[in-house]
């Protein structure tokens, strides 16, 4: 993890300062597992999570309508472009981050200063995430937005793939929820959503027929 932010590094060759938001969400989940398996103490895990949420909550850390970029500088909190036009919010990577943060919110429930701060900061971050902004007023969600390039990436999120968690979190937001029609007409509308074929005697409900439902990370990332 990055020594100042606590965020996960982007692979071994991503540079000393490049942190990945989605991978950091997985890291938060791994910290909880590490506590349960006895690899670290609850107190050690709580301090690591607190470092992450402090960094994400800092006013100098870039966020866009409550979402983060795919990559950011783990020291300064500034966005590192993933590609030429992908230099702002990535709601899929942000959803993976929130997946971990919300699990931590429900795990660290003791009444002590550290765990109280963790829950309070995560709750603030969760309530600031503007999921409905990323629909552009349409019945589908868009993967990217940036102040420099707006909606230029123009990547609609449709299923079935690793992005299901985006719609789940968007629908459950207490402050900026998406409408039900966004799920049904957006995520569930693609011809790669429903399957129903049998492979090796197992009926597959969702996923692309050509790829036997797709790779396992389609399921792993959201569930």
State what each model feature region is:
Residues 14-18, 35-41, 84-88, 208-212:
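Second-shell loop/turn segments in exported
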Residues 22-26:
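Hydrophobic alpha-helical transmembrane segments
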Residues 1-19, 63-72, 171:
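Low-complexity, Ser/Thr/Pro/Gly-enriched N-terminal "stalk/linker" regions
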Residues 28, 46-57, 98, 119-130:
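Hydrophobic core segments within long, regular secondary-structure runs in both alpha-
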Residues 62-94, 107-223:
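Extended ligand-binding clefts on enzyme/binding-domain cores
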């Amino acid at each position: 993890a990055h020594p100042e932010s606590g965020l996960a590094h982007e692979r071994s060759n991503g540079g000393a300062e490049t942190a990945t938001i989605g991978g950091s969400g997985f890291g938060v989940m791994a910290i909880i597992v590490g506590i349960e398996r006895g690899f670290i103490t609850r107190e050690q895990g709580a301090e690591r999570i607190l470092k992450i949420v402090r960094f994400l909550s800092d006013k100098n850390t870039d966020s866009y309508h409550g979402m983060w970029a795919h990559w950011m500088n783990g020291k300064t909190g500034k966005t590192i472009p993933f590609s030429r036009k992908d230099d702002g919010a990535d709601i899929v990577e942000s959803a993976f981050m929130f997946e971990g943060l919300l699990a931590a919110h429900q795990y660290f429930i003791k009444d002590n200063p550290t765990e109280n701060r963790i829950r309070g900061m995560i709750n603030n971050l969760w309530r600031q995430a503007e999921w409905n902004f990323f629909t552009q007023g349409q019945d589908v969600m868009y993967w990217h937005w940036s102040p420099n390039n707006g909606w230029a990436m123009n990547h609609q999120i449709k299923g079935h793939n690793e992005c299901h968690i985006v719609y789940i979190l968007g629908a459950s937001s207490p402050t900026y929820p998406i409408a039900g029609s966004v799920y049904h007409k957006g995520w569930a509308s693609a011809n790669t959503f429903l399957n129903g074929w049998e492979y090796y005697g197992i009926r597959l409900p969702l996923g692309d027929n050509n790829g036997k439902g797709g790779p396992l990370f389609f399921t792993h990332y959201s569930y």
